[in-house]
Amino acid sequence: MKAIHVNWTAPFFNKERLRGHGFSITKNISSKTYELPNYQILYTILSAIRWKKHNGPIKLYTDSIGLSYYQQIGITQLYDEIDTEFLDNLQNVDPAYYWTSGKIQALQNEKEPFVFLDQDFIVRGEVPADFYYGDIGIGHWEIPRGSYYFTRQQWESEIKHIEIPHNYNCNAYSPNTSFVYFGTASTVDEYVKAHKKLINSGENEVPEWFWLATDQGILGHVIREHEYHTNTLTDRIFLADNDYAKPEDRRFGYSEQWYYPVEHDKTKDQFEWEHVWLAKVVFANDPEFMERECQRYYDEIWDLGGSNYLYYFNLNKYWNKEKHGH
């Protein structure tokens, strides 16, 4: 199965206006030229290598600045195909407000079926064949709760440029969009069309939560409106804005990250995948944890035979003579 990565650099050049819990490190990069932190380079390499090893070819959508940077750090050979034309010509999008729009709009260039793969999503095996028997496949659903989700009343009072979509269900599960299989052309077309309507906000200010509505929220709406059959890699459902509690804390009523529906298939969890996701928030506050994770990514890339992609000088500190040889 073909997958795509998307690296749109426009948000970097608007980083002072970026909003969200995962941008602390990026916003602190002082360079005026495009640059990525080590962890982002490493998980991008690992994500691509793992996909190619287990599942098939991978294509990169980026812009000319992104391509030049990838050439500089020596990772363009990860990709079977690279497209810069689309993102070079992407216009009329605020990359600070809608920083995932580049990846969403790039989808419309692909022929089905294919997988969109966030660069921080690592698949460590062959995706089960029955995952592809449907219109759409996602990593998992999320229970919407907290500041990144909204009520109908919030939309009606805070969003001025467009009415809430007809039949929008604020209580329904939200699909995590870090890993999405598109099995038909209509799934892509309807998703991108709905997304583009929402981001046409002109000069209107929008609250921070709105970007997620234009990304995960609207995909869930499209799935329900068109009754697209949706498979998941796991039956576990992520609870947004949870307490990150451990099982022993249940007696106090603290909430955990993951929950199973009453009827579920635990055998799905034999399939191994990792989404760096929330760890990126922790990285900003715990640099030692970040360095341990970078070392883990580096070691795994090395063990997979990917040493050719680790020559970038910023990554040299993870090389260990005893562990990695000469």
Model-predicted regions and their roles:
Residues 1-91, 282-325:
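N-terminal anchoring/stem segment of glycosyltransferases
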Residues 38-41, 46, 88-116, 124:
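A conserved donor-nucleotide-binding helix/loop in the catalytic core
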Residues 57-61, 115, 261:
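A structural signal for isolated positions on well-ordered beta-strands in alpha/beta enzyme cores
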Residues 119:
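Short acidic donor-binding/metal-coordinating loop in glycosyltransferase active sites
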Residues 157-171:
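Short, flexible, basic/aromatic active-site loop/helix in glycosyltransferases
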Residues 169-284:
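Catalytic core and acceptor-binding pocket of nucleotide-sugar-dependent glycosyltransferases
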